[in-house]
Every structure is written in structure tokens, then in C-alpha cells.
A protein has these predicted regions:
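Catalytic cores of RNA-modifying enzymes
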Residues: 1-208, 212, 254, 258
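C-terminal lobe and adjacent flexible extensions of AdoMet/dcAdoMet transferase-like proteins
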Residues: 216-270
């Protein structure tokens, strides 16, 4: 008999998924591709139970990282103690973690019902771990839309979209209403499924340089790009780059396409 679920900790952004259809869609992702599985923030093991069954049936190494010390007794219903690491996921150097667990040479699938209050910094960490080849992540809908705009036909470029899609191909797996959780959040959610590009648009070694450039580019979304960039780059270089791309200096960052953002980065970094 399973243990009764504890109360969710609001300060940690906890909302326990209870919709069996959504659980099944998440836990069935990347079949035949994943060679090892990491779950971040498993909580009382709602996804863990099914991920553990799948990992066992497919012979996949499976580990979880959890911060809340109330949850090991729940997790031990489904996995062993040596599969559980109790720490703050934001503080984990993922590549070192994978090496320690002897899965650094495998195609790793990362799964998480992300704590909504730290979903963006966690995602930024995940992007930088080359061992992670696949991700299935639950976001607050507003954040998911910034990673992969699925609720509008209009292109709204932003720094989170640009940095994520530089390294991963993204698509919507499913939308998730508040009633799918206990307690229900005040917002809608969405699950994105993400596959690492075989060749990233920008080398991972330049991640921080790209991140810095994107922060500048999107620092004042309503301001014209020519005005934003001239404080950091020579005007002749800006003008020649914009001419080459066929875009006006008066364009705003949110109107750019991803390929234009990347080309602008490449040209201006010279």
C-alpha cells in the first residue's frame, strides 16, 4: 500500500501531478532513445514510480535528485537509496554528477515537473550539460511559451527561446490544466519535449558569451536594436552586419528570427 501524499511546500513551488494521462505521456517519451534517466525534483515519486518501472524493463540506469528531506521514504517505495541524491539541483554540477554515476558516456534523458519558481535557472543548467540528449519538462505555460511559442502564430523572439533552441529542438508534448495537480496552481502548465541538436547553432564552449549577448539584445525589448548595440559595438560593424542580414537598425529584438539572432551574434563577436 502506497504512503499517503504529504502536503506540498508552496515555498519550494511544489504541485503534485495527479493526472494519469499526463503522467503516461511524460513517462513514455523518448522510448528506444534514452540510455539513462535522471529525474529532477521527484517529490513523493509520482513520476518516479513509472520511470522506475520503465527503466527496469529497458535496463536503464535511473537516478533522482531531490531537495526536500521529507521525500526519501516515499521514493524508497520505488527505487533504492543509492539512486537518490539529496541536494539542491541548482547546486549540482551535472557533468560531474553523471561521471560519478558512471553514465557520462550514455544518452541521458532528463525528466522533471519543474518547480515553477526556479524553472528558468534549472533549464539554463540543463542546457550546459552535453550528456543530456533528451528532456521532458513541465513548465508554467507562460514560461513554456517563452521557450517554444505554441499558443500564438506570431513570432515572439526572446532570450530564453534563443538560448534553448540554439542547443535543443523543442515541441509541445501536451498542455496541462490546473486541475491535473494537487494542489492546483493558479496558472496553466505545459510539457515540452526537447532533443539536443547534433550540431548546436553555437558551440557549447561559447554558451556564456552567447548568454551575455542575448541579455544585451533583449535588455530593452521595445527599443530599436541599433540604439541598444551601439554602446557595446563599433557602429560600422553594426551597420555592415545589419546590411548583410537585410534588417534595419530600427528593428526590435522580439521581431528577429532565431537564425538572425545567431548570425548577428557571430558577426558582432568578431
Amino acid at each position: 500500500m502506497k504512503m499517503e501524499l504529504p502536503l506540498a511546500n508552496k515555498s519550494l513551488g511544489q504541485h503534485f501531478l495527479r493526472d494519469s494521462g499526463v503522467i503516461d505521456r511524460i513517462c513514455s517519451d523518448f522510448k528506444g532513445q534514452a540510455e539513462a534517466v535522471l529525474e529532477i525534483g521527484p517529490g513523493p515519486g509520482i513520476l518516479t514510480e513509472f520511470l522506475a518501472l520503465r527503466s527496469k524493463s529497458e535496463g536503464l540506469p535511473f537516478f533522482v535528485i531531490e531537495k526536500d528531506d521529507r521525500f526519501p521514504p516515499y521514493l524508497l517505495q520505488f527505487i533504492n537509496d543509492n539512486q537518490i541524491t539529496m541536494t539542491d539541483a541548482l547546486a549540482v554540477h551535472l557533468s560531474a554528477f553523471f561521471k560519478e554515476k558512471n553514465i557520462d558516456q550514455k544518452n541521458i534523458w532528463l525528466v522533471s515537473n519543474l518547480p515553477y519558481n526556479i524553472s528558468t535557472p534549472l533549464l539554463i543548467n540543463f542546457l550546459q550539460a552535453p550528456e543530456i540528449k533528451y528532456m521532458t519538462l513541465m513548465f508554467q505555460k507562460e514560461v513554456a511559451d517563452k521557450v517554444f511559442p505554441f499558443s500564438t502564430t506570431k513570432n515572439y523572439m526572446g532570450s530564453l527561446l534563443a538560448i534553448t533552441q540554439t542547443y535543443f529542438d523543442c515541441k509541445l508534448l501536451c498542455k496541462v490544466p490546473p486541475g491535473a495537480f494537487n494542489p492546483p496552481p493558479k496558472v496553466d502548465s505545459a510539457v515540452l519535449t526537447m532533443s539536443r541538436r547534433e550540431t548546436p547553432l553555437v558551440p557549447l564552449s561559447e554558451f556564456h558569451a552567447l548568454e551575455k549577448f542575448l541579455r544585451l539584445l533583449f535588455s530593452q525589448k521595445r527599443k530599436q536594436l541599433g540604439g541598444i548595440l551601439k554602446a557595446s559595438f563599433p557602429l560600422p560593424l553594426i551597420e555592415s552586419s545589419f546590411n548583410t542580414l537585410g534588417i534595419p537598425l530600427t528593428i526590435r529584438a522580439e521581431a528577429l528570427e532565431l537564425n538572425q539572432v545567431i548570425e548577428l551574434y557571430r558577426m558582432l563577436k568578431k
